[in-house]
Amino acid sequence: MQQITSKENARLKSAAKLLQSKKARQEQGEFLAEGYRLCMDALRSGLLPRQTFVTEQGMEHQDCTELLRASEESYVIPQSLAAKLSDTRTPQGVFCVFAIPDN
């Protein structure tokens, strides 16, 4: 697992674009899920995370190990950068990038 400390990190910026832009989601064929419940629901439905971003606090959650094992790439981020990936006031500490499934 790698650590990201800069808000200028390319992977972090790419994930943040998925949150902010429908066009980015369509072009990249990916979406960003926030929170353990949404990420675990996606995982249980058969989607595998391409990237998982987790804060130190988020690593304490019981489902963290399962998400990190399933993810292609995993990153630890500080709480200050979690706000960049969140549209909530208090980020839950875990964010996963998934491929948009074909219907």
Predicted regions and their residues:
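Boundary-proximal intrinsically disordered activation/regulatory segments immediately upstream
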Residues: 1-63
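Glycine/small-residue-rich loop that forms an oxyanion/phosphate-binding "nest" at active or ligand-binding sites
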Residues: 67-99
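Nucleotide and nucleotide-moiety/phosphate-recognizing core
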Residues: 102
